[in-house]
Amino acid sequence: MSTYNWDEKHILTFPEEKVALSTKDVHVYYGKNESIKGIDMQFERNKITALIGPSGSGKSTYLRSLNRMNDTIDIAKVTGQILYRGIDVNRPEINVYEMRKHIGMVFQRPNPFAKSIYRNITFAHERAGVKDKQVLDEIVETSLRQAALWDQVKDDLHKSALTLSGGQQQRLCIARAISVKPDILLMDEPASALDPIATMQLEETMFELKKNFTIIIVTHNMQQAARASDYTGFFYLGDLIEYDKTATIFQNAKLQSTNDYVSGHFG
């Protein structure tokens, strides 16, 4: 790896009208340690972008910065701009909870509430004051349909979500996240705990979801990135090295380091 010039970058950009979210000079620190090193990146609307790189490359830390999940870590500090609809959501006066309604998150392992399937979807809406059962029913059905789960659970909505399979639980978590109608859905290795069949079902769900949402996914699975994304960004040691169309990254990467990583020669 000593032969690579890590200062050499190739970063795709988009016309402003196509951009759903962007970052400018984003750094993330854990105490005095710099985990993310000044990343400029744009995400195209209604596309799936995969973030890849070795363990410790910073891709999950960067993803978590996009809706300020790093705020939950006492020693974490994020600098730079995270721009959504022209607003820097990294500013201290931003209401983080309101912002996360627009930029949602699905975590690595399914984390359904210990409630019914129905109340997993309605819980946040009920807390926000929605009481009309017809409205709640519509939210549940629409969200579960979008997450490709409705047909499997429509007769069991009042059963515990914990009785679902791992793949079904993850799609329920997706349904819960999209029920508040975010523009952007962040996914941190959402298939890592799933078997191959559930993984394929999740990817098929993602293809449908991108009609209505912009999806940014972290994955260690090169085959998944190649299959399921429109764009791919390669991270290494806290830096974005190459960002381009997925087909280009996997078939004709501009940088030797990227080509060697996706072909399994290091990492």
Curated annotation (Swiss-Prot):
Q: What span is annotated as the signal peptide, if there is one?
A: none
Q: Where does this protein have coiled-coil stretches? A: none
Query: How does the UniProt record describe the way this protein sits in the membrane?
Result: Peripheral membrane protein
Q: Which SUPFAM superfamilies match?
A: P-loop containing nucleoside triphosphate hydrolases
Q: Where in the cell is it found?
A: Cell membrane
Q: Could you name the Gene Ontology cellular component terms for this entry?
A: plasma membrane
Catalytic activity, reaction form: phosphate(out) + ATP + H2O = ADP + 2 phosphate(in) + H(+)
Amino-acid positions noted as binding ATP in the UniProt annotation, renumbered to this chain: 53-60
Is-annotated flag, keyword Signal?
no
- Which family, according to the similarity comment? Belongs to the ABC transporter superfamily. Phosphate importer (TC 3.A.1.7) family.
Instruction: Tell me the function of this protein.
Output: Part of the ABC transporter complex PstSACB involved in phosphate import. Responsible for energy coupling to the transport system.
Q: What is this protein called?
A: Phosphate import ATP-binding protein PstB 2
Naturally occurring in which organism (per UniProt): Streptococcus pneumoniae serotype 4 (strain ATCC BAA-334 / TIGR4)
